[in-house]
A protein has these predicted regions:
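Active-site neighborhoods and metal-handling regions in enzymes and metal-associated proteins
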Residues: 1-215
Length: 215
């Protein structure tokens, strides 16, 4: 049976398998951290181009976080030494920044997690370096559609965790795409990675209920 835990904004939390339910102060902290993450990705849009290295992207992301009073949550996390993840083409996720330069037509996912005032804002976005192929562009478009359908499924009253993965998988397979199941989304807040694990495939009306908390 799924356990839920109501969390005060200043309460120490632990990764204990419970799904955390935050109040208005917690949501405000996450909203600020998430907004900063989105602003960083917005700023990187014009920076990502052929010839730029993923290490330079990492440097720019780190500078923007520090300038905003945040720190990169990935820095030092389980031995990781960079400020973001940069995954090019066939790299699914968690690619490591390096001196590798982007090439014309590359698609790259940039994953940033600023830690601002004790709250995490973890998000990623797909970018094109130059002009992508029709095949690459279509992959990114369908992936984005899957994301929005997953969010829509989660937003319905009475939604369950399995509804998210079911919506994502159904749309992807409609266009003959597979769904990666070795990696997943996750809860966050005071903790970088927390319950629940949000897989990208599933059956409707299964899993824990998604509690709608007033934010």
């Amino acid at each position: 049976m799924t356990e839920y835990q109501v969390i005060d904004a200043d309460e120490t939390v632990y990764r204990d398998g419970t799904i955390k339910l935050h109040g208005p102060e917690g949501f405000e902290g996450m909203r600020k951290a998430g907004r900063l993450a989105a602003e960083i990705l917005d700023e990187l849009t014009s920076f990502v181009k052929p010839g730029v290295t993923t290490g330079e992207i990492d440097d720019k992301a780190r500078t923007m976080m520090l300038d905003a009073g945040a720190v990169p949550a990935t820095m030092g996390y389980r031995g990781y030494t960079h400020s973001c993840c940069t995954s090019i083409n066939h790299v699914i996720c968690h690619g490591i920044p390096s001196d590798k330069a982007l090439k014309e037509g590359d698609i790259v996912n940039i994953d940033v997690t600023p830690l601002l005032d004790g709250w995490h804002g973890d998000t990623s976005r797909m970018f094109f370096a130059g002009e992508p192929s029709i095949k690459a562009k279509r992959l990114v478009e369908v992936t984005y559609e899957c994301l929005m359908l997953g969010i829509e499924a989660a937003s319905r009253p009475g939604a369950r965790l399995g509804d998210i993965g079911a919506a994502i998988e159904a749309h992807a397979r409609q266009f003959r795409y597979g769904v990666v199941q070795e990696f997943c989304g996750h809860g966050l807040g005071r903790l970088f990675h927390d319950a629940p694990e949000v897989v990208h495939a599933g059956r409707p009306n299964t899993g824990p209920e998604l509690k709608h908390v007033v934010a």
